[in-house]
Amino acid sequence: MRVSQTSWIVSRMLEYPRGGFFYSTDMACMMEGLAEELAGGHKDEVLIVSGRNGDDEVFKEFPNVRAADGLKGPNSIDPETKLVLIIDVSPTAISNALAATLQEFLIPVWVFCNHTRTLTASVTRRLGYKLWPKGTYTPYICEKAGVSEVVTYNQPESEKFVAFMSAARQIMDKRKSKKTMQELAFLPHLAFAEIAMEGDQEMTPTLTAKKVSDIKDEQVNELASAMFRTGKLSHLDMLSVPDCVYSCGEALKREVAKAKANRERFVVALRNAQYKKYTAGLLEAGTPVKTFTEVIKNWGAYDTIFLPMGVDWTYTGGSNLIRMMMTPGSHKTVTFVPESDDVHEFCHNKPTVNTMGVESAATGLAAELNRRWRRDNPVDAS
């Protein structure tokens, strides 16, 4: 499915009914979507509290916009409120009485994380204490810079488990991969081989497990049990099909076919020549596949830029392309993410991991996944 990035962010936020942390450059549009989903479009049931100047104008369509001290009193919020957005507000501005109301009435609270003024672990810890019950897993839903649309695709269990291991490897501060999580999702066989070749004493036994019960590490087992409900793991055959096109590659092929049918001027953009060669081999001969540097040199030649492996600020080619993507114009930039993006989000969730620690955050995420499973698989009372 292909949607606007704002719609994708809203859909991810809706997966977490208690709220969490987020970053978006178009908060007004995002809030429109959340208000529609959570409050039936009734904007008077949404409370926005901001310590920034000018937000009353940004959110002029919302009647309940308050300054940073707007959460001081015990009766400063209506229990019928469907959503609270907090921007640049100190934890000390949230009274204990209000905190109790938020938790008692299960009101979703989303806290804006400013990229230019990152929340410290101390601040996120105190905010977490005030806003959510102890042990609540709060996600960090982050906008992908310069991206206008997002294609979501369904990963098979085998690829999900390799993504799970790749995230565990990064979170546990094992040898850092030079590849991003989106690159590893496009190249799951490479991610599998990379972990296997390291021969890490802790990671290898988990990587070679045939079922969840084979995973001896209690923390990893708990999270894997919540993610892989059948208990079976089918990733060990991944390297046996060398020419396999994985789920993200299949999604890319579908989008490229649509672009050709619509006679769009499009390009598939990758970080380097190695990725370019691999991706070109998946697509029909003659499909325009370029490196980021080549796309920048020919900027303006394409209406649609497909980014199957994403793009990141952490390397020069990526940051240069993002700057071009963010310039005004009619171009569309399209990235690809799994439908269930919990693993990727957990890997980048510094606000919560820094606050709770890796073990508590993993336990909290397992509890959240179990809650969703119960929601989607209700017990028949009859």
Swiss-Prot record:
It comes from the Viruses. This is Uncharacterized protein 023R. It comes from Frog virus 3 (isolate Goorha).
